[in-house]
Amino acid sequence: MNTTEKKEIKNFRDRIDKSIIRKQKSMQEHIELLSHKNIREVDKEKRLAILKSTLQQAVELEFGTIPIYLCALWSIKDNLDPIAKSIRNVVQEEMLHLALACNMLTSIGGIPKIYDTTPKGLRYPTKLPGGVHPELTLKLSGLNDDSLDDFLEIELPQGEIFIEEFKGKYHDANEHGEHSNTIGALYTAIQNEFESLNPTMLPDKQISGPLAWFVVDDFKKIKSAINWIKEQGEGAIEATEEDIKIHELSHFYRFLEVRKRKKIEKDPVTGKYSFKIDLPFPDVWPMAVVPEGGYLKKDVSSEVWDLTHQFDLTYSSMIHTLESAWDQGGQAALWKAIDMMFNLEKFAIPLMKIPIPGKKGNYGPSFRLIKY
């Protein structure tokens, strides 16, 4: 090893030390650190600290999209509408992804953190955690073309989009083909570091159960968990058209169907997939974008405030319960949290039926965490 190489390694180690101390790191920084050619020259405990930080970011990313998808779902008047069913499945799968990310973090001694009432906690509108898709701001609103454009950006595949040429709302910010700032890219870096570091993985406090959550205690299961997340969300990196089955569309292609008002169908002659059958857009409550900080008591009627406050209280309790599942609560706490999440609609939907005086659109939930 020559002097230049030794200096590079020292500089990288110093960078790792500074990164561990710094609380807020971008997704790109996590990817760069885990993928750096000198990562193997770093002390194992420090590499483990970076991996834990990266997995915590994955947990925040998986959870961060759920409220905006729930708003879209609840705004659909007929909950049996095919599009409502599709979005409901997306939410359920995002919960699965969250559970798998929490299991991966717990497997190496980390503690998933979601409940955060400090100014650094999740508040809408917001950027995706870690600087993923920095051009995008997550907003709480009903189902419409603007929200669908945001959903497509969130679920943008890391690999090629093969149904047809895709130009999204933020196409000037992306070079389509290989996308380096996607959630899939983050998981690729996580998988590679698990393989390289080969940490001891413990099943303690992980969750497994009937909804296909499973304990990750070796690299094979890590790889399975990450592949599952990628394929259900953005779509498989190496997917071919034969991999896409109509009833198993990734989130990106499900949202693309709704945006195009067309179902993706396979041509029995050519074997190619394209947009064919009309997909009627559902009748929705016109939920307006929730303002920064949410709706305040002084600005709304007592009816709106009661619904808003009850929603926030229940939501906060749900998040607290969800987080406890990977501490002491286990499967029972997770089931309780999921049940609470879907019960939030009894406050959200009545809000969505109330027009905002003097403005366009209706009210909706603010998804505020309350300290209790």
Predicted regions and their residues:
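Non-heme di-metal
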Residues: 2-372
